[in-house]
């Protein structure tokens, strides 16, 4: 079977001799470092290929409205990525000119590690060859299951004590017949074959014509597209008189209460009309009139929110073109969840506790996991995982504000059944109201579920958005910019707070308001540059 490996020529050439750790790696907090110091210690590779033992390799760049270019770079040691080593350079220089510049005006954030040569030496000659062994051992835990999309990345892992280790990041996709898929992911010690950390990386939660139809559920009320909300954008094939629940931006797939499906859009017969407006009809399911209509509309709103407010695609293809949002509805049997799997959004129809999960807020949440994945890449465990979840909750409130001009400050309130005993899944004004989430960073402990650690940044967002002269849009402006230009995959709550301050400064917003909001949730900004 073919597996995906991520290696550079230098990595293979230098795989010569593994040694035991001698001392801890030395972290450099980049917001307090000088650009000249970093250039002396690390070769800057703007082509993404490591050319020296200690290097920073280009990942992506983004130029904001202030003409500042934010260049993301992954640390590599002898060609292998360093997990936790990540830099973002902020200057008037593009990535191509950054390596040659001598300017002291380059600002930075992130963390990189020096001293890896002393601690690690060179990897053993079998390090690369043993990558498949690590993957197969990890895969063996899921024997007799439907496994695919296997990946292994040889790397350097920095643990919580700043000890560096040769390691492998392994992941597989496990498809189930009776429940949602999983993406078990782990970082494995190359010496002991034991995991340092592990988590599930599935993030939960033709000719154009117009469509009319119904949406909503018993709790939020029912409404009509073409009357209460805009007409739906459809595609019609005149040759076979068929309309498709698809447009350039969004495609809706009917899972028919199964766990796998074809990739074709939902369709229905539609004879020619004088107005070129076609009734989608509706398929009532668990108290909702038409989950497919709601999904198509939610995708439209979310995509346009990111475009109208920020001039960016909510999701992009590898060539930078807009990615069509794929919304899979009627998923599974009694499935009370929704998730983003790296390619598409999937929505269950609920059961006893929930109505179908195709509300605007839930859709914005799942789609925005993809936005985070394509920008900061916040890892989905620990404090960065809480930030990842929280950004998607923020996006849910932003989508409500974009659509109806106000935010509910509840997550999932519109889909919870009255008989469930719950009025929402999470609360941004007081996260601890759900009995599990934390309100402040000093309440965090290792192993806390990311849906509960999200309370810190959810609370921060609410406090900031409700300050005088602020609103949901303005607060989301700050968080989007922090996600795009300042957060790294490994950001902690405090490091993320520095990114929020930097984003607010770039946008010309009140730093005192941001600082007081950070302080209210016990995020320490004293070390921010």
Swiss-Prot record:
Residues bound to Zn(2+): 365, 369, 389
Family to which this protein belongs: Belongs to the peptidase M4 family.
InterPro entries linked to this entry: FTP_domain, Peptidase_M4, Peptidase_M4/M1_CTD_sf, Peptidase_M4_C_domain, Peptidase_M4_domain, Zinc_Metalloprotease_M4
GO BP terms, alphabetized: proteolysis
Pfam families, sorted: FTP, Peptidase_M4, Peptidase_M4_C
Protein known as: Zinc metalloproteinase MspA
Required cofactor(s): Zn(2+)
Positions of the propeptide removed during maturation: 25-204
Lineage, broadest ranks: Bacteria, Pseudomonadati, Pseudomonadota, Gammaproteobacteria, Legionellales
Cofactor note: Binds 1 zinc ion.
Catalytic center residues: 366, 451
Keywords: Hydrolase, Metal-binding, Metalloprotease, Protease, Signal, Zinc, Zymogen
Disulfide bonds: none
EC identifiers of the protein: 3.4.24.-
Organism this protein belongs to: Legionella longbeachae
Name of the coding gene: mspA
A single MF term (Gene Ontology): metalloendopeptidase activity
